[in-house]
Structures are given as structure tokens and as C-alpha cells.
Amino acid sequence: ESSVAFSNHAFEDAVDFSNFIFPHVTHFSNTKFSSDALFSNTTFSGDASFYDTTFNIRTWFDNTIFNGNTWFSNVTFSGEVEFGKAIFNGEAWFIKKTTFSNDACFDNTVFNGDTLFSNVTFSGDSRFGKAIFSGDTLFTEKTTFSGKAGFDNAKFSGITGFYNTTFIGEAEFKNITFSGDAKFYKTTFSDVARFNRTLFEGFTSFRETSFEKSSSFIAIKGQSFFSFKDAKFHLVPDFNQAHFIEAPQF
């Protein structure tokens, strides 16, 4: 299969791939973008991989379509990153110490395949508002949200896992629908955590999860088995108007 490769290349000036169609497999390896990088409304027809790549200023992937599998491995985003309304039709992997040093926006982003954030650092605020996760979704391997993390109004259709994940800033999980199992395992919420008005349709677990400040589960709906086994609440959680199909496990 034909491919387009940018290896060991440095873009000193702003790069604009907006509205461009990459017709084949696309590789960016050990590539450096010293100024703004624009991939707005771009289409990657095949697999797209970004390995050991650095984006020094702002980066735009808004309204971008990734039709194949996509990898961001050991990538550094030093400036603000915009993935708003992007569509990932294949698997999306953000792995191996990929770092968002500034704010990262995934508002209204659509993940149609399985999604993995493994050993990723979000140093600024991160937004996944109204994002759609159609496949299985996993945040794991010490993925850390240092700023405010917002998932309000997102929809998770497959199995969702937050394993060994740390939220240092406020964590907002309001008005979310988890259609499949939702598992928060050995996850730490160092600041306020809000799950208000969220619908949990599948098996839900917060096992060995630590809530170090206030946590609220106001008006949530748990429609299957719900477990807080071995969870640690440093303050009394707020379950006002919460509804469980059966008593949750503590």
C-alpha cells in the first residue's frame, strides 16, 4: 500500500494542511513543527501515525476525519490543541508519554472505534464535552489530568475504563451516558469530582478509587450493579436524589 512519510523533518514555519486529503497511509516520525500546525478539515484516508513528534506552538485537528487507525505515540503538544468535531473512524491511540502541555479540546469529537489514552499527561485543561465514544474506551497507565477535566454530556457506548488514572484538577462527569460497563479502578480524584445527572446503564465500579475532596453523585441513575468496594471518600459524598436499581456495594 502506498504511503506518505515525513521522517526526521523539521517544519520551521507555520504548516497548513487544512482541507487537504491524504489519500494513503500517512506517517509523521521524529518530526518537529516549530510554528503553528493546521490540519483543520483534513482527511486521512488511511492509517495515520505520529511517532516521536513535537508540536511547539498551536495545533489544529478540528473537523478532521481519520478514516483508518490513528496513533499519537510519544508526541508532545507544547501549545494549545484543538480536536473539536474531529472524527476517528478507526482505532485512536494516544500512548507512550504523549503530553498535552497546554489546553486540549476534544469537544464534540467522535470516536467510532476503540480509544486508548495510555500514559498520557494533560498539563492544562482538557475538554471532552459532548464527545461520542462508540467503541471501548480506556484511560490507563498513569494517565494524568493536571488541569480541569471536563467530560460533560459525553456518551460512552462500549466498555469504559479509567485505570490508574489521576485527576489533579476538578473532574466533571455530568450528564453523561455510560451505555456499557464503566470501571474506575485505582483512580485518584485529588480535587472536586462531579457525576451529577449521569446515567450508568451497565455494571459500574469505583473499586479502590480515592476521592480526596468533595464528590457528588446528585440525581445519577444506576441501572445495573454498582460498586464502591474499597473506595476511599475523604469527605461524605452527595447522593441526593440518586437512584439505584439495587443498593450499591460499599
Where are these regions (language model features)?
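N-terminal leader/targeting and pre-domain segments
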Residues: 1-250
